[in-house]
Amino acid sequence: MIFSGVEHMGQVPFHTVLIHGLVRDAQGRKMSKSLGNGIDPLLVIDQYGADALRFTLATGNAPGNDMRFSDEKGKASRNFANKLWNAARFVLMYLGNDYSYPGLPKDLAIEDKWILSKVNTLAKEVTDNLERFELGIAVAKLYDFIWDVFCDWYIEIAKIRLQSGEGADTAKAVLVYVLTDILKLLHPFMPFITEEIYQAIPHDTESIMISKWPEYDPTLSFADEEAQMEKIMDAIRAIRNRRAEMNIPPSKKSKVYVETAFSDVFAVGSEFMKRLAYASDVEIADAFGDLGNTVTIVTNDAKIYIPLGDLVDFEAEAKRLQKELAAAEEKLAFINKKLDNPGFVNKAPEKVVQQNRDEAAKLTEKIANLRSSLENLGK
């Protein structure tokens, strides 16, 4: 195309050309007519959307390396687009039809400073990645920020103020600011959905294509608030993980005791813990006395105690564990009986024998854990 442009037009059509690796099929094979593994982009667009196709081709794209295309990647990109769309719908629902963006207020909460600092850093890093043609790295950062940081954390935390009304105007302004920056940074990869959302939220240019590219702003760098939010988020993650391990449903709330040297930080985050860590109440102190039978969770910045009685019906849980233990012991005895039989070990395929050995090892570990849980329950 370059030679043709020079020959017929007398000028170079492109000054910068990025040469990428081959797009291979899901098995890593080169696409060819003989293999019949070619992909019709128009069919992919019909199925997942043009934005999802563009995003998929950029994801994991490293200079000099080939990439594999699969339906799973297309579905993941479509799901990502849906996640962004639903986040935008949520923001618009609270903005209403007559909302006018007032700019960022001066009185910002810790979570506002945290997300603004995060998106500020994101703008700098994505810009640097694009200038170095590191498209795959830029896309990965955008994906992680939008899905995890913005949707799963900030929006969930912002709901507290939006639903209570107190501080709602500040939350709305920050949501618009961050969403706008996200759309601009994502636009090179997903131009259609970003333009559609941009037109729906307060905007200052006719099209997102001619809007100002986000730039790093030193006044929006809040390192202290970022560190404080990480302490709170680490605690919330730890509580959620422990509850998941114990199969505690979100509907079952519990009091949380936080023993920490950072009382001021966790006092600010107590409402976040109530919403995201399913706490009925949060008590914070430098140290606690005997709290009785509790689940203990340790993070880098706090020791967290949850009364076991708030989480578990001891009698019902004991019956459940005993039933599960009996079933596991019965299954292990059956497998061990097969493995003790020379006829089975010598005649069965090695793969089948190994599967039984692996299953026996897993059951042995499970039985030990169940017995330990029963012992702890009785303490």
PLM segments and residue spans:
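Short, solvent-exposed helix-loop connector elements
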Residues: 65-73
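Conserved pre-motif C helix in the palm subdomain of viral-like polymerases
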Residues: 1-5
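Feature 926 captures the class I aminoacyl-tRNA synthetase adenylation module centered on the KMSKS loop
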Residues: 7-46, 50, 72-379
